[in-house]
Amino acid sequence: MKFIILTCLLAVALAKQRMEQYISSEESMDNSQENFKQNMDVAFFPSQETVENIYIPQMESVEAPMKVSDIISQQQYNQKMMDMSVSAREKTVMTEESKNIQDYMNKMKRYSKITWPQFVKLLHQYQKTMTPWSYYPSTPSQV
């Protein structure tokens, strides 16, 4: 526990030292922020005054002409969606084997909802007791 606290304090102290290097004076603050951005890949948000002084020209709303590749890809997308909706409506006929598998999976879903001790109790009810006489069938022999 002491080691973790010591490590955290050391990390905070090193972080403060790095920040103090970048904020040494008012004149070098802009340069240091640029260097810090380049070195650390961090985004700084501009102050309110800088945001108000920025001129943003109003752009006219002009629709870009659709390229031929965009039109083709849009048609392909529409065709795929239509195929998917048609295939979703088709009913599939299940074979006997797939019905058996689905029934088995539905039965197993019930067991996934119960806890382990309940499962063991339920399983114990269905187990056959094994005795040597029932396991090894033998016929009485005459001597």
Curated annotation (Swiss-Prot):
Expression by tissue: Mammary gland specific. Secreted in milk.
Residues that span the membrane, as ranges: none
Organism: Mus musculus (Mouse)
Location in or out of the cell: Secreted
S-S pairs: none
InterPro entries documented for this protein: Alpha-s2_casein, Casein, Casein_CS
Family as reported in the entry's similarity comment: Belongs to the alpha-casein family.
UniProt-recorded name of the protein: Alpha-S2-casein-like B
Stated role: Important role in the capacity of milk to transport calcium phosphate.
UniProt-listed PROSITE patterns: CASEIN_ALPHA_BETA
Superkingdom assignment: Eukaryota
Keywords of this entry: Milk protein, Secreted, Signal
GO cellular component: extracellular region
Matching Pfam families: Casein (PF00363)
Signal sequence coordinates: 1-15
